[in-house]
């Protein structure tokens, strides 16, 4: 880490600032209710949702040649077919997908304490939102949680040539804010993208949000700092700046 004070903080979005996993679970529960009440599925409803969750976790597509709506509707169509058999049911798949999507967007909320933290931090440093993912999906999340006004810039991996952990997207963020990598801190919940990316780009520090308290594998990227909540960040940044002051 360099000897300059922190001038900018890059935040991940999903499961760092908003509870994407929790919102997705709520969406799945609504689909289960739909399948059980309207279509009289029993245990198959949960099996279908479990299959979709696996497909989402392994999702890989080219954003310039494939529509995320088509990809994710197909996840539901395949899961229904694999579970129930019979003819493909695109209409039911679409109903499930849009219910899941709309429900989870309703629950993607920027909590009041997070808003307050961002507001206070922005008085001292520049803030940038750096999120991987499909352009449409991430823009919808940003709109849903209404976080635009808390940041000086927003960068979405799906709109760039490379996503986290590629150094190039971090350098692009630095250019947008007029800062150097050694001035910046990356905050996120994913070691392989947020932390590894910050390390690759030579940022001043990386902060891992480890809500579950899990112990990282020895082969995993090692963050400079680890906290259980993003709300611990202001105190941590003060500590980092104090170390700089003592070193100068």
From Swiss-Prot:
One term of GO molecular function: N-acylneuraminate-9-phosphatase activity
Disulphide-bridged cysteine pairs: none
UniProt entry keywords in alphabetical sequence: Carbohydrate metabolism, Hydrolase, Magnesium, Metal-binding
Pathway(s) annotated for this protein in UniProt: Amino-sugar metabolism; N-acetylneuraminate biosynthesis
Enzyme class: hydrolase
Co-factor requirement: Mg(2+)
Name the record gives this protein: N-acylneuraminate-9-phosphatase
Keyword Hydrolase: yes
CDD domains xref list: HAD_Neu5Ac-Pase_like (cd04305)
Superkingdom assignment: Eukaryota
EC number: 3.1.3.29
Species for this entry: Mus musculus
InterPro entries: HAD-like_hydrolase (IPR051400), HAD-like_sf (IPR036412), HAD-SF_hydro_IA (IPR006439), HAD-SF_hydro_IA_CTE7 (IPR011950), HAD_sf (IPR023214)
Signal keyword on record: no
A Pfam family: Hydrolase
Regulation: Inhibited by calcium. Inhibited by vanadate, sodium orthovanate and phosphonate.
Catalyzed chemical reaction(s): N-acetylneuraminate 9-phosphate + H2O = N-acetylneuraminate + phosphate; N-glycoloylneuraminate 9-phosphate + H2O = N-glycoloylneuraminate + phosphate
One GO cellular component, as annotated: cytosol
């Amino acid at each position: 880490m360099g000897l300059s004070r922190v001038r900018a903080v890059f935040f991940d979005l999903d499961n760092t600032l908003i509870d994407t996993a929790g919102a997705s679970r709520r969406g799945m529960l609504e689909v289960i209710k739909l399948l059980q009440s309207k279509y009289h599925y029993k245990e198959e409803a949960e099996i279908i949702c479990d299959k979709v969750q696996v497909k989402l976790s392994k999702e890989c597509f080219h954003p310039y040649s494939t529509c995320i709506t088509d990809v994710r509707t197909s996840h539901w169509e395949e899961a229904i077919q694999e579970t129930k058999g019979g003819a493909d049911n695109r209409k039911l798949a679409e109903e499930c997908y849009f219910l899941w999507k709309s429900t989870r967007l309703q629950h993607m909320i920027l909590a009041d304490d997070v808003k307050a933290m961002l507001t206070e931090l922005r008085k001292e440093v520049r803030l940038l939102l750096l999120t991987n993912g499909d352009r449409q999906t991430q823009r919808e999340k940003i709109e849903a949680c209404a976080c635009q006004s808390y940041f000086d810039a927003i960068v979405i991996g799906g709109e760039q040539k490379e996503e986290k952990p590629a150094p190039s997207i971090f350098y692009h963020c630095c250019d947008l804010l007029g800062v150097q990598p050694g001035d910046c801190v990356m905050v996120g919940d994913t070691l392989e993208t947020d932390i590894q990316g910050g390390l690759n780009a030579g940022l001043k520090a990386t902060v891992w949000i480890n809500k579950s308290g899990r112990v990282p594998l020895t082969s995993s990227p090692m963050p400079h700092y680890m906290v259980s909540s993003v709300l611990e960040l202001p105190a941590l940044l003060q500590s980092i700046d104090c170390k700089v002051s003592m070193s100068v």
